[in-house]
């Protein structure tokens, strides 16, 4: 009989609804800071989530408007978006998705190793986990966009995590929303 030894969690949209509670308002706040009249609504943002990475979303949206942004402008807007995102997290504006805390804690009690594999940056993950799991960190390690050459949906982040964990794929499960 095979027992579960490892769980690999996606973060945004799986552990917490960060996309709508933090990323979306952070994008809109950064657009406002730069004097752009852009205001992404929920349906527009959900469509933009098909594009991986915040900078890529900004660049894509720019191409579809009359305002073409330079690469430097995209980078600066994205840096400002990161600032707003971290402020939102710091102010406890994001919650765990229903049932996640209970499942994470139960797996932790049963000594099932848990890992986060995400397209978010390390600074985002560190702060979010600190805020969401106040009394403990149930995760052995994180694989973030800072750790891999090709972010998700490329399989390399998960393959990297599985290699680092040393757990066979037949004894693992992935929770992912994309």
Where are these regions (language model features)?
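Active-site neighborhood of HAD-like aspartate-dependent phosphohydrolases
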Residues: 1-44
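Glycine-rich phosphate-binding loop signature in dinucleotide/nucleotide-binding domains
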Residues: 2, 109-112, 165-171
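Short beta->alpha linker loops
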Residues: 22, 53, 95-99, 120-121, ...
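Substrate-recognition element of Asp-dependent hydrolases with the DxDx(T/V) motif
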Residues: 27, 100-130
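Substrate-recognition "cap/lid" segment bordering the active-site pocket of phosphatases
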Residues: 121-174
């Amino acid at each position: 009989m095979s027992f579960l030894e490892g769980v690999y969690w996606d973060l945004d949209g799986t552990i917490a609804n960060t996309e709508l509670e933090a990323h979306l308002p952070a994008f809109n706040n950064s657009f406002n800071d730069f004097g752009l009249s852009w205001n992404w609504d929920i349906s527009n943002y959900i469509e933009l989530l098909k594009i991986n990475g915040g900078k890529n979303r900004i660049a894509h949206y720019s191409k579809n408007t009359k305002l073409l942004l330079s690469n430097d402008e995209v980078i600066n807007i994205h840096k400002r978006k990161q600032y707003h995102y971290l402020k939102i997290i710091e102010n406890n504006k994001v919650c765990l998705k229903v049932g996640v805390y209970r499942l994470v804690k139960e797996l932790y009690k049963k000594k099932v190793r848990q890992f986060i594999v995400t397209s978010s940056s390390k600074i985002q993950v560190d702060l979010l986990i600190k805020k969401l799991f106040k009394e403990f960190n149930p995760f052995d390690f994180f694989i973030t966009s800072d750790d891999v050459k090709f972010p998700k949906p490329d399989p390399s982040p998960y393959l990297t995590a599985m290699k680092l964990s040393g757990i066979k794929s037949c004894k693992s499960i992935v929770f992912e929303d994309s």
